[in-house]
Amino acid sequence: MAVKTLKDLLAEGVEGRHVLVRSDLNVPLADGEITDPGRIDASIPTLRALLDEGARVIVAAHLGRPKGEVDPELSLAPVAEALAERLDQWVPLAGDVTGEDAHERANGLDDGDILLLENVRFDPRETSKDASERAEFAAELAELTADNGAFVSDGFGVVHREQASVYDVAKKLPSYAGGLVSAELEVLEKVSGAPEAPYAVVLGGSKVSDKLGVIEALAPKVDRLIIGGGMCFTFLAAQGHDVGGSLLQEDMIDTCKDLLERYGDVIVLPTDVVAAENFSKDAEHKAVGLSEIPSGWMGLDIGPESADAFAAVLGEAKTVFWNGPMGVFEFPAFAAGTKAVAEAIIKATDAGAFSVVGGGDSAAAVRTLGLDEKGFSHISTGGGASLEFLEGKTLPGVEVLG
């Protein structure tokens, strides 16, 4: 699909033009402070390129799930500060999304100025299931660009959503894929097209149901499919193991049995786990074999034997895609499995493998555990979007650019 890109827009010329950029600035906050600025950092190159060429940039983004109403705790104010720091220029925050203040500020922009709109999800039309409501909101966003405006889609973490500021607005303005979206698509096409073998995929996270589509899509294509995290316990139960009080999707056991029957030679499961008495960072815990989980205890990480086995598989890989932690990495006692897998991927990358971290919790884990982000070939900013792409689904926010 031929999609116009940021390079095309810059070649056409942006000096004096209002350019609406949909960025993904949905960062985690704790007490109003940004705890992981990864997505903000990833948005900077596209914004910088436009500003340097004299564009009048208007940024649309969301934060959290405010349910279509104003929530001061989900204001983009901390994000405006973080952008200003990184761009080394003032980034004013509009007091609304498409209201009087946004219009006034947008009209007052000079060449090379930037404006951040307030959280687009403060307006219920952004995420409405009613296409006419979304179209109405998209038209209001487009109006902010005055005459000769343009739209740049640069929020890869939201391109799988059919939302007003992602999808509908692209129908109202000349539209382009931003540098980040272009780079993300290029990387994912590389791992989904003809990846160099052996190709190993690591999937973690809590629910099998969330990853079923990607398991079905990837299992026939990969050499090894490593499964850890909370979702592994439903697979282990399907093998007949008693998983104690571990996270279990009973309605998915038969599905896991079927997957193991079809792809048992590809799927790699843990052989030991770190079990805990309860779900807390200070819980009593120990590494045990699969038949030794104490009654009522729950597995909160893969065990050391499994970590070594997973690392051995990854050591032979030439292409690696990783999405989802191996355990509750937020608790130090249950972070070892995730760290071991991440370090094995870094080692494989150093030996020449092409590695992609599929956004979401995996990217957060890399940063939380203090690992070198440059040790991976690519860290995606979009967990859900990258999974849907690998499932073979169309991404509405990309398709609409074509």
Curated annotation (Swiss-Prot):
GO terms for molecular function: ADP binding; ATP binding; phosphoglycerate kinase activity. InterPro entries: Phosphoglycerate_kinase, Phosphoglycerate_kinase_CS, Phosphoglycerate_kinase_N, Phosphoglycerate_kinase_sf. It catalyses: (2R)-3-phosphoglycerate + ATP = (2R)-3-phospho-glyceroyl phosphate + ADP. Pathway: Carbohydrate degradation; glycolysis; pyruvate from D-glyceraldehyde 3-phosphate: step 2/5. Its main location: cytoplasm. Disulfide bonds: none annotated. One of its GO terms (biological process) is glycolytic process. It is an enzyme of class 2 (transferase). Coiled coil: none annotated. Substrate binds at residues 24-26, 39, 62-65, 121, 161. This is Phosphoglycerate kinase. Monomer. Its EC number is 2.7.2.3. Pfam families: PGK. ATP binds at residues 211, 299, 330, 359-362. It is found in: Cytoplasm. One of its GO terms (cellular component) is cytosol. Belongs to the phosphoglycerate kinase family. Keywords: ATP-binding, Cytoplasm, Glycolysis, Kinase, Nucleotide-binding, Transferase. The lineage of its organism: Bacteria, Bacillati, Actinomycetota, Actinomycetes, Mycobacteriales.
